[in-house]
Amino acid sequence: MSAPAAAPAKVLPSRSDFDEKEKEKDVRTSNIVAARAVADAIRTSLGPKGMDKMIISPNNEVLISNDGATILQNLELRHPAAKMLAELAKAQDIEAGDGTTSVCVIAGSLLGAVSQLMAKGIHPSIISEAFNLALNKSLEVLVSMSVPVSLTDRVSLVKSATTSLNSKVVSQYTNLASIAVDAVLSVINPATAVNVNLKDIKLIKKLGGTIEDTELVQGLVFDQTASHTAGGPTRIQNAKIGLIQFCLSAPKTYMDNNIVVSDYSKMDKVIKEEPKLILEMCRKIQKSGCNVLLVQKSILRDAVNDLSLHYLAKLKILVIKDIERDDIEFICNTIGCQPVANIDSFTADKLGKADLVEEVGTSDGKIVKVTGIPNPGKTVTVLCRGSNKLVLDEAERSLHDALCVIRSLVKKKFLIAGGGAPEIEVSQQVTAFSKTLTGITSYCVRAYAEALEIIPYTLAENAGLHPISIVTELRNKHAQGEINSGINVRKGAITNILQENVVQPLLVSTSALTLATETVVMLLKIDDIATAR
């Protein structure tokens, strides 16, 4: 009798295959959890009623801010996915200047949707394709909602800047929005401008006074004081301004050397040579007609010594020393002077002109103002004031955000409602769009749409309102065709946000959605983390 046939061996999946799939899942989960933790950390600072964060640096310096990019930039983040969210806020800050908190909150909400979709077994590639599809539809909806704006319409520009400042510590000071608008309009041609170089707007911080004392100066402001050595002048009318990049002192040799003096007469000659040389340089400066001298800071030694300051004071030349190298280009563009690197090149054609250069006292020292420039360049200076360093730093950041908002309007001349109105409208229209699709893609697009409701939900939550009832009412309003209905956190109700003058540049919303979606898709496609050697 023959033996029974052996059963075919059952092939089991190898342990390595199982481990690989589990590893991919763990890596994605780790990335999503880390990124969402960062988004949740700054979510409470969204909107006009959002909270501020106090950050203490390793050297015990205190920073108070509710600007998303500033907060994340100063946090010590270790997880690579968390760092990606910090870079996301930075990218939004560079592109639009505002919406840095919103972009992180949206990214966090989208990652939450991704987590739920992956738990249902949907492949990351399908989710990525669906999210890109939903993004394109979202951008179409945002563009259709927008209202064109002219750069000559100053009122609309001020409304946009005010909306940006509403969520800041300085929101109660109404003059900052006007200053931001006037500063941008001063450095561009409204008829032809397509961008703004914010380097043409210089922010000078000076302690003392209140934020209301912040002013726009059509000219130059120097944080340095005029030199008072030997009673030099502190006020010059009909100023002719020179800018030097060399030292007004005895020249130094390029190598070490020794001078051997054999008698007293030679020693006396050596000692007298230095004052003679410096006096000759000062007279050359006076001969050119210069009566205000700006001296670039030197890292090797003092750019001007007491002797040269004494001679310049006797020649009635006002001296401002320690001008930073980074400020040279701005100064030259403003007053039309040219930097001079050698005393022999110091001639009248290199000088700039101004009606008045004077030293002005403030509660925290003195500054020098240059006003009445006959042919000013397209530059302005904003003198920021504040009662303490924390307030002053936050005022500077807030003003920078307002300037960036106006720059966004110069780049893309369209306004859109705020208060969560665009997000709810996009959510509803993308949900309707998902019904025209089939299969898993439809499901993923709908999840994308629902994730966008996080913005109005968070605005309501931070304002102390009931978020679920507010978002439900908002959906009903938009379903009835009221596309500009949004959350008015001041009144604690839903109103027509456009009529309430709560507006923002279209570029802020489109940039936030695009960057958030791109970051989520990028995180979604990571299946392993390796450490480089």
From Swiss-Prot:
Residues 1-26 are annotated as: Disordered. Residues 16-26 have a biased composition (Basic and acidic residues). GO terms for cellular component: chaperonin-containing T-complex. This is T-complex protein 1 subunit delta. Keywords: ATP-binding, Chaperone, Cytoplasm, Nucleotide-binding. Pfam families: Cpn60_TCP1 (PF00118). One of its GO terms (biological process) is protein folding. The lineage of its organism: Eukaryota, Amoebozoa, Evosea, Eumycetozoa, Dictyostelia. It is found in: Cytoplasm. Heterooligomeric complex of about 850 to 900 kDa that forms two stacked rings, 12 to 16 nm in diameter. The gene is cct4. One of its GO terms (molecular function) is ATP-dependent protein folding chaperone. InterPro entries: Chap_CCT_delta, Chaperone_TCP-1, Chaperonin_TCP-1_CS, Cpn60/GroEL/TCP-1, GroEL-like_apical_dom_sf, GROEL-like_equatorial_sf, TCP-1-like_intermed_sf, TCP-1_chaperonin. PROSITE patterns: TCP1_1, TCP1_2, TCP1_3. Belongs to the TCP-1 chaperonin family. Molecular chaperone; assists the folding of proteins upon ATP hydrolysis. Known to play a role, in vitro, in the folding of actin and tubulin. Its main location: cytoplasm.
